[in-house]
Amino acid sequence: MSKYIPFTTEQKERAASVDLEEFLRRRGEKLITSGRDKRLASDHSITIRGCEWFDHATEQGGRAISFVKQFYGLSYPDAMSLLLGDDLGGSYPAAREKEPEPAKPFVLPPQSESMRRVYAYLLQKRCIDREILNAFVRKKLIYESCERSRDGTKEYHNAVFVGFDEHGVPRHGHKRGLYTMGQSYRGNIEGSDPKHSFHYLGGDDTLYVFEAPIDLLSHISLFPEGWQEHNYVACCGTSSIPVLEMLRQLPQLRQVYLCLDNDAAGHAASERMAALLEEHGLNACLLYTSPSPRDTR
């Protein structure tokens, strides 16, 4: 049991304001750049910015003290002592005060001259049904992007999964690398509105929820009968925001199938979404997907 240690108000604020990026680097944690944030290499669902953190799997977050308590499993006194420097003999720097950031405009990347790579990847590597892929392409929900490196010597091709609002305006984009060697890039385009994540609305009373766009396409390929009548959404992660938007747009819903990944983050998100759906008077059926070794996203 940790002994009681009285901390002053100044000490509490100093501990809460510790720069988490520097703190984690000093402790040997690997961080990955993700837009303006950093992600933990050991847990991609957690993002860090300054003294603040957010776990996108559990939709919880806070400042440095709560992070150290949760991530390292420490008591409040032990977390305070660690952040104030008792562990290494010196204090950690405070995070810089955040300046207001202008809203990042949402811009889809330029299209490639052909869809050759995206068709080859989705049909041959991911076994998506051609007719289903054609249907999504015709609706401009999927296309192949082509972006050049800063020095203009390289081209980068990605599959782009587009989310539209109710007026047909693109509001969200998720990019997935098409290279099959090593770890492929995936991520949401900056400025994307999570409410309008990649989705298809058929209009009936059934909704299928997935983490990744390719999971959505794979499910339809496996169960194509009457798919045009159903509703589907890929959260491009584990946030509940796209699901709430579907509830708003589809008041006729009666049944929701949660088809998230069969891992810890998927289980936690499914339970959270099921509780949310219950609050709205809807039944939720859990149908976990099994990620393949080469990454189903």
Give names to the regions the model predicted.
Residues 209, 254-263:
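Acidic beta-strand-to-loop metal/phosphate-binding motif
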Residues 246-247, 268-280:
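Short, aromatic/basic amphipathic alpha-helical patches
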Residues 288-297:
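Single conserved hydrophobic/aromatic residue that forms the stacking wall/gate
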Residues 55, 68, 122, 211, ...:
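Terminal peptide-recognition signature
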Residues 238-240, 260-270:
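Acidic, metal-coordinating catalytic cores used for nucleic-acid/nucleotide bond scission
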Residues 1-91:
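N-terminal structured subdomain of primase-like DNA metabolism proteins
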Residues 81-114:
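Conserved active-site segments centered on acidic
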Residues 147-249:
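Phosphate-handling DNA/RNA-contact segment within nucleic-acid enzymes
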